[in-house]
């Protein structure tokens, strides 16, 4: 495994650990999800370029489209929760709470 793949995998793991550790705030969870998506994008792009997969060259762009949609929905949810409750705690998203 080359150092490029190792560094990208390490970035994914750091983002995953950040998502697991700082899951109380919605903003930090969204940032960690974006870090995971960015590392997946770079990993896919490097793999496609190194292995000359010309048929799969659209996959990173499709992943970026899904990441942009996820970011837009996450930020709209963050604005809605912060306007309603005044904070960005994830526990405010529980619909069963009275």
Swiss-Prot record:
EC number of the protein: 7.1.1.2
> Which reaction does this chain catalyze?
a ubiquinone + NADH + 5 H(+)(in) = a ubiquinol + NAD(+) + 4 H(+)(out)
Source superkingdom: Eukaryota
Molecular function (GO) terms for this protein are: NADH dehydrogenase (ubiquinone) activity
Which locations, inside or outside the cell, does it occupy?
Answer: Mitochondrion inner membrane
This protein's membrane topology, according to the annotation, is: Multi-pass membrane protein
What the entry lists under Pfam families is as follows: Oxidored_q2
**Membrane spanning residue stretches:** 1-21, 29-49, 61-81
Task: Extract the coiled-coil ranges from the record.
Answer: none
Give the InterPro entries listed for this entry: NADH_UbQ_OxRdtase_chain4L/K, NUOK/Mnh_C1-like
Keyword set, alphabetical order: Electron transport, Membrane, Mitochondrion, Mitochondrion inner membrane, NAD, Respiratory chain, Translocase, Transmembrane, Transmembrane helix, Transport, Ubiquinone
GO process terms (BP): ATP synthesis coupled electron transport
Tell me the protein family, please: Belongs to the complex I subunit 4L family.
Role of this protein: Core subunit of the mitochondrial membrane respiratory chain NADH dehydrogenase (Complex I) which catalyzes electron transfer from NADH through the respiratory chain, using ubiquinone as an electron acceptor. Part of the enzyme membrane arm which is embedded in the lipid bilayer and involved in proton translocation.
This chain belongs to which protein, by name?
NADH-ubiquinone oxidoreductase chain 4L
């Amino acid at each position: 495994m080359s150092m490029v793949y190792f560094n990208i995998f390490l970035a994914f793991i750091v983002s995953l650990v950040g998502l697991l550790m700082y899951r109380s705030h919605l903003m930090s969870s969204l940032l960690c999800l974006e870090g995971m998506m960015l590392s997946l994008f770079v990993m896919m792009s490097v793999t496609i370029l190194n292995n000359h997969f010309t048929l799969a060259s659209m996959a990173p762009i499709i992943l970026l489209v899904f990441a942009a949609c996820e970011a837009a929905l996450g930020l709209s949810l963050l604005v809605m929760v912060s306007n309603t409750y005044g904070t960005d705690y994830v526990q405010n998203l529980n619909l069963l709470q009275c």
